[in-house]
């Protein structure tokens, strides 16, 4: 996994988790939803990079 892509994925996941927690605590469903979406985006980016690494190994 490229280091910059991995860092970006981890950053998106962390930001998403924070937004979900803050949105849930504040009762802000919009922020909570945006956090969930951002966390999912980070998860997908990480999965994409892992798949690319697996293909390169073969």
UniProtKB/Swiss-Prot annotation:
So which domain of life are we looking at? Bacteria
Q: Which SUPFAM superfamilies match?
A: Hypothetical protein YjbJ
Q: Which Pfam families match?
A: CsbD
Region spans: Disordered: 1-58
- Chain intervals with Basic and acidic residues compositional bias: 31-58
Q: Of which family is this protein a member?
A: Belongs to the UPF0337 (CsbD) family.
Q: What is this protein called?
A: UPF0337 protein SAV_738
Which organism encodes this protein? Streptomyces avermitilis (strain ATCC 31267 / DSM 46492 / JCM 5070 / NBRC 14893 / NCIMB 12804 / NRRL 8165 / MA-4680)
């Amino acid at each position: 996994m490229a280091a910059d892509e991995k860092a970006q994925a981890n950053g998106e996941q962390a930001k998403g988790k924070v937004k979900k927690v803050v949105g849930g605590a504040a009762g802000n469903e919009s922020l909570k939803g945006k956090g969930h979406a951002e966390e999912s985006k980070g998860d997908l980016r990480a999965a994409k990079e892992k798949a690319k690494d697996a293909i390169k190994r073969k």
